[in-house]
Amino acid sequence: MKKYITSLVFLLTLCSFAFANVDHKTLAIGESAPDFSLPGIDGKTYTLQSFKNAKVLVIVFMCNHCPTSQAYEDRMVKLTSDYAAKGVSLVAINPNNPAGLRLDELGYSDLGDSFEEMKIRAKNMKFNFPYLYDGETEVTANKYGPVATPHIFIFDKDRKLRYNGRIDDMENPAKTPHSLDARNAIDAILAGKEIAVPVTKTFGCSIKWAEKSVWIDKAQIQWAKEPVKLDTLSADGIKEVLKNHTDKLRLVNLWATWCGPCVAEFSDLVTLNHTYRDRGLEFVSISADDPAKKDKALGFLQRKQASGLNYIYTGDDKYKMIEAVDPKWDGALPYTLLVEPDGKIVYAHQGAIDAEELRKIIFDDPMMGRIYKEPVAKP
C-alpha cells in the first residue's frame, strides 16, 4: 500500500487538470480547427485537408510516456474501428517537446516521446489511426491548447469545435466508465443534435512545453547535490546484497575504473537509476578496483553523480568476489544483474549492456510496468 501511495503521489505531481493551465489558450467551442502540417509515423505529412471527407474529425493529443495516455490507447484503437464506417476520422498528435521531459517522468514507460519511439509504440499497440509529431516546434499544440495528455477535440463536418476535454470519466481501463463523453459527443454530431456537455475537465500528464526545460535544469542541479559515498564490502557482504532483503528491484553492476566498457556504460546505468528509482529501482555499484585506489573510484562516481549504493570490494581474492556475485559469471567486467526481492536474478549480463534492452527488461518486470496492467474493459 505504501509503495502504491508513493507512486500515486509522484504521478499526480506530473499530472494536470484542465483548469490548471493558464499559459496556453485552449480552443473554444465553435471555433474553427486550425490547420497543421505534421509528419506521421508512416512517412506521410498530414494537414487538415487530409481528413476533408470525414463527417466528424477527432483530434486527440496523446503521448508515449504518460500512464494516463497509455491507459487510453486501446480505447482509441476501438473508437477508431467502431466509427470508421460512420465517416469519423481520428488522428493522434504528440505535442511533447523532449526538452521539457524529465528522466523521472519516463519511469512509467518503456519508451520516451521522440518521433522514433512513437513508431515503436504504434507498432506495439497496433494503432489504426495516424500518429503525428508536433514536439519539435509545438506550433499545432499552441494553436489547439491541450492542457494534458490525453486531451480530445471533436469537430463537425464544417470543422467547428463541438467538444473538447476528456475521453471518458474512468482512467482505469479495467473499470467501466460512467460517462462516455467522447462517444456521446460523436453520436450527437452524427445525429445532428446538440452535445449535452461540450466541455469537460481533462486529467492527465501536463503538456511538455519547450519552456519547461527549466524542470530538467532543476533536476540536474538537484541530482548534482545528492551525496555520493563509497563503502567497503567483503565477499559475504556481496552475498547479502544479492539476497536483496528489500522491497526494491536491484540493479547491480560490477565495474572498475580501469575497465573501458565499464566506464563507457556507467552513465547509462545512472540514467536508468534516475528514471526508475522513484518506482522502486535501486542501483548498486560494486567496484573491483584495488582498495588502495578507493579515492579514484569515488572521484569517478562523484563525476557521474552516482548517488545510489556504492561499494568497493576489499578482499584480496577476486575469485571469492566472483563466486559471491554469481557462480555462472566468468569474471570479465563489466557484469550487470537485475535482482528481485529475496534474491531472484532475472537478468545477468557479462560485457557492456544494451541500455535500451535493459530499460525494457526493467520496465517489463512485474515490479514495474504500466500502472494499469489489467485487461481493458470494453465500453
Role assignments for model-derived ranges:
Residues 7-16:
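Bacterial N-terminal signal peptides
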Residues 156-230, 332-379:
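Thiol-/selenol-based redox modules, centered on thioredoxin-like
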Residues 63-75, 254-271:
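Conserved redox-active cysteine motifs that mediate thiol-disulfide chemistry
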Residues 110-149, 153-154, 162, 298-333:
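Short, internal strand/loop/helix patches
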Residues 87-112, 127-137, 280-294, 306-318:
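Thiol-based oxidoreductase modules, predominantly thioredoxin-like and allied folds used
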Residues 55-57, 62-65, 248-250, 255-258, ...:
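Short pre-active-site segment immediately N-terminal to redox-active cysteine/selenocysteine motifs
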Residues 38-85:
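N-terminal, post-signal-peptide region of Sec/Tat-exported proteins
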Residues 37-57, 229-250, 270-276, 322-324:
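A short beta-strand-turn-helix
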